[in-house]
């Protein structure tokens, strides 16, 4: 009985040493761990005016002492000078093929992160620059499932994987001046 236990212990120890050797030799480690790049959605919505017009808790202001009233946001967009407090950061991103994008909404209201063929107007004409039409990828707003899938809510994130080599353009279909160009090498 004692001999069987010693034999089993020896086999177990040998197996563990072999497995440990594989790990240190890289036999079970991923030689190319996934790469991640982050894009952050920002805004400065004023909870009082946004929530009065759009419903309770639509805007959860996250800025300290800086906010934009809903009417001011509309006026700036209509004048062709959209509010710079609504932004994707960075504006341009250079990544390697296989890199995952993590898009985080650190603003106070929802956004979309929609891939588009070319930049243009979103689905809310009041927020489009003068003469700017809604682009096909944003048409229909959230009733279009393709647009709804790209929505990111306050405090949430989305993961974009499998981008091919080349240039990829993303914009918010609500606030169309929020734009990012991603170059995949």
What are these regions (language model features)?
Residues 22, 26-185:
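Extracytoplasmic copper-binding redox domains, predominantly the cupredoxin/blue-copper superfamily
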Residues 9-10, 87:
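Hydrophobic alpha-helical segments and their boundary regions
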Residues 10-21:
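Bacterial N-terminal signal peptides
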Residues 1-6:
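N-terminal secretory signal peptides that target proteins for export/translocation
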């Amino acid at each position: 009985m004692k001999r069987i236990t010693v034999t089993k212990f020896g086999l177990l120890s040998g197996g563990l040493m072999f497995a440990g050797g594989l790990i240190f030799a890289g036999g079970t480690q991923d030689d190319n761990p996934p790469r991640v790049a982050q894009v952050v959605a920002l805004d400065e919505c004023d909870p009082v005016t946004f929530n009065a017009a759009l419903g309770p808790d639509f805007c959860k202001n996250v800025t300290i002492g800086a906010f934009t009233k809903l009417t001011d946001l509309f006026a700036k967009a209509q004048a062709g000078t959209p509010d710079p407090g609504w932004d994707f950061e960075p504006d341009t991103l250079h990544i390697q093929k296989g890199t995952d994008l993590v898009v985080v909404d650190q603003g106070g209201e929802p956004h979309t992160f929609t891939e588009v063929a070319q930049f243009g107007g979103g689905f809310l004409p009041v927020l489009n620059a003068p003469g700017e039409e809604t682009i096909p990828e944003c048409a229909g707003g959230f009733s279009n499932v393709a647009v709804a899938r790209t929505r990111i809510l306050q405090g949430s994130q989305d993961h974009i994987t499998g981008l091919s080599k080349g240039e990829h353009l993303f914009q918010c279909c609500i606030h169309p001046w929020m734009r990012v160009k991603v170059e995949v090498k």
